[in-house]
């Protein structure tokens, strides 16, 4: 993929740098913020190509967040979510295999719509949410998170809703979220590189230019 053909104008660069800034801020626990970057990049560079462009940015932000909060994760929740998330991950790959390429943008749009519905549901239920004690609650959010992260890198709000619903403290929330996505996002790299051909040496150079904007998470971290 020739990324030089996709990023040609100051507007394209502006969208890329703004998205990196948003992603960096989202890693500090600002619920739903990362959803803004997904449609921005998809509209600018195309639905499927944008997933390969955004993934290294997410991986850099995840690594910084883990280095910053590495000692305060609640691992029992990471281990509870990961198996179902991997099932969702594989399910997303199977769905991608059977749909025509032109339908990917609709699938991504559907994932974003589902995430928004879950966010609205969470706000509506508020403190009255009694489902978090059900046995299927964690696996459901893991499955949904795995599917939506593979298709649209849109699982941030899904995980935020789950971790907040189990009454996780602020610092533990950020640390647990960071470790979960570090594992999931780094697992996605081989798929993007070798199956979807969305990550190239050229795209990685472009992503490297966004690092100063990602570093904003160090200044917006909760204190």
Per-segment meaning from a language model:
Residues 62-72, 107-133:
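Transmembrane helix exit motif
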